[in-house]
Structure formats: structure tokens, C-alpha cells
């Protein structure tokens, strides 16, 4: 079981931790708290750092939804979004759900797979608040869902559970930053210290290719090697990252 510190006199917290199999540990490095009805992760030995939480309603993701370039964004091109085509996507490495939310806001149905129970708990809470929002709740409930389990084992399990045919598998494995830690965003540093690098990421490509009917998209830092050493069909480059696209079949309406 994953250990975490939390206030055991807070019933909502205790039930969330119980649901995700999180074990109370008075000496745990991380703590889960509710701040303004938002489930938040805090690194206990760095109290000055902001807590980590999932927010689909306000902040950066809301700004990107409104002003981020729509289907002209690189991620939209990578998954094959075009006129009349809105693929069903399994996000095999959901993290804090930001890329999944972008794709869902553009019309894709997205099943998020997250293997770390603390991150899954944060995602569930973010979905809860998103579903309740009057502006985005209706389409979020239709298009965004969460499946918890090992990314490799669960790639096929997630769509089977909802009887969904998958057009695209999207992967964004955690990759070690080559910059010195001071240059890495503090939030990302905390997040990496929680989940670690995805050292088994190369093992994701084969099951992803088996599951996707149309293509697999892998988001990588610009300096990273090809996933599992396999050359992609095409590459869409951005300022600091790239999307490696492994095409199996044409995207058709």
C-alpha cells in the first residue's frame, strides 16, 4: 500500500484514502488535505511550496480551453483531430489530466489511466468538481472518465470496462529532467518526487500499438530518445517537446 499522512478526524479525507488504498503513516513525506473543498497534495518538508491539485475549472487549463488555439494546437494535430473526426482516446499516463482535458474540450472522448493511487485520488477530485461546474460539467461527464491501474496492464482493461473502441492511445511518460532541479518547475519537482520517472515506459509502446486502431501518440522532451527505440511515422515538434506519432490506419470520419 502507498503511505500518506492525513487528518484522521476528517471523514471525507479518510474515506478518500480508504477508497484508493492509501495507508496512514505519521512519518510520510506527503500529506493530503482539503483546502477550499479541493483535495491537495503537500510535501511536508517543503511547506513553502504550493500544494498540488487537479483543477479543470479555473486557472491555466481554463485559459487554454478558451484561448489556446483550438484544433490548431500541436496535440490536436498529433491525435488526428480534424473536420468530422473526433477520435476516442486512451490517455495511458494521465498525470494531472491536463492533456486529457485539452483533448476532451476539443470533442474527444478520453479515458484517463493513472496507476499511482495518490494521483488517481487527485484526478477523481478534479473530475468531481469539473462535473459539478455549470459551464463545462455536461460535456466533461460525457467525455472524461478515470480508470485506476498499472498503465501497462490497464491499457486494454480501461476501454473493455466501458465497452469502448479506442482510436488513439496517448502516452506522456515521466522523463527525467536534464536541467538542474532549480530550473525545473517546483510543482513538477514535487510531482516527480512522488511518482518517480517512468522507468518501464518503453514497455508501454507495444500494448498501446495493440490497443489503438488508428495511431499511438507519444509526447517526449525534445532531447529524449524514441520510445522503446522505435522510430515514429511522423514527428510534430513544439518549442520544448515533440509528439511522436505511430500511425496504424488513416483517421476517417
Curated annotation (Swiss-Prot):
Pfam families: SAM_MT. GO terms for cellular component: cytoplasm. It is found in: Cytoplasm. InterPro entries: 16SrRNA_methylTrfase_J (IPR007536), SAM-dependent_MTases_sf (IPR029063). Signal peptide: none annotated. CDD domains: AdoMet_MTases. One of its GO terms (molecular function) is rRNA (guanine-N2-)-methyltransferase activity. Keywords: Cytoplasm, Methyltransferase, rRNA processing, S-adenosyl-L-methionine, Transferase. It catalyses: guanosine(1516) in 16S rRNA + S-adenosyl-L-methionine = N(2)-methylguanosine(1516) in 16S rRNA + S-adenosyl-L-homocysteine + H(+). It is an enzyme of class 2 (transferase). Gene3D superfamilies: Vaccinia Virus protein VP39 (3.40.50.150), YhiQ-like domain (3.40.1630.10). Disulfide bonds: none annotated. The keyword tRNA processing does not apply. The keyword Transferase applies. Its EC number is 2.1.1.242. S-adenosyl-L-methionine binds at residues 98-99, 114-115, 150-151, 172. Belongs to the methyltransferase superfamily. RsmJ family. Specifically methylates the guanosine in position 1516 of 16S rRNA. This is Ribosomal RNA small subunit methyltransferase J. It comes from Shewanella halifaxensis (strain HAW-EB4). The lineage of its organism: Bacteria, Pseudomonadati, Pseudomonadota, Gammaproteobacteria, Alteromonadales.
Amino acid at each position: 500500500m502507498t503511505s500518506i499522512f492525513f487528518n484522521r478526524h476528517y471523514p471525507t479525507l479518510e474515506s478518500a484514502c480508504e477508497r484508493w488504498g492509501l495507508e496512514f503513516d505519521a512519518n510520510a513525506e506527503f500529506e493530503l488535505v482539503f483546502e477550499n473543498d479541493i483535495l491537495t497534495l503537500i510535501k511536508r518538508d517543503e511547506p513553502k511550496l504550493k500544494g498540488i491539485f487537479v483543477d479543470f475549472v479555473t486557472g491555466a487549463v481554463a485559459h487554454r480551453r478558451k484561448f489556446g488555439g483550438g484544433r490548431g494546437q500541436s496535440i490536436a494535430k498529433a491525435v488526428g483531430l480534424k473536420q468530422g473526426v473526433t477520435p476516442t482516446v486512451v490517455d495511458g499516463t494521465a498525470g494531472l489530466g491536463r492533456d486529457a482535458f485539452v483533448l476532451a474540450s476539443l470533442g474527444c472522448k478520453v479515458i484517463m489511466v493513472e496507476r499511482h493511487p495518490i494521483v488517481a485520488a487527485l484526478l477523481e477530485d478534479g473530475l468531481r468538481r469539473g462535473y459539478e461546474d455549470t459551464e463545462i460539467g455536461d460535456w466533461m461527464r460525457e467525455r472524461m472518465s478515470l480508470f485506476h491501474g498499472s498503465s501497462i496492464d490497464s491499457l486494454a482493461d480501461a476501454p473493455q470496462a466501458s465497452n469502448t473502441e479506442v482510436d488513439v492511445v496517448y502516452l506522456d511518460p515521466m522523463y527525467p529532467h536534464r536541467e538542474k532541479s532549480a530550473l525545473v518547475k517546483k510543482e513538477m519537482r514535487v510531482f516527480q518526487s512522488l511518482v518517480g520517472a517512468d522507468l518501464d515506459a518503453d514497455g508501454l509502446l507495444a500494448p498501446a500499438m495493440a490497443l489503438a486502431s488508428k495511431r499511438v501518440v507519444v509526447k517526449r522532451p525534445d532531447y529524449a530518445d524514441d520510445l522503446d527505440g522505435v522510430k515514429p511515422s511522423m514527428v510534430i515538434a513544439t518549442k520544448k517537446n515533440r509528439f511522436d506519432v505511430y500511425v496504424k490506419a488513416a483517421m476517417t470520419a
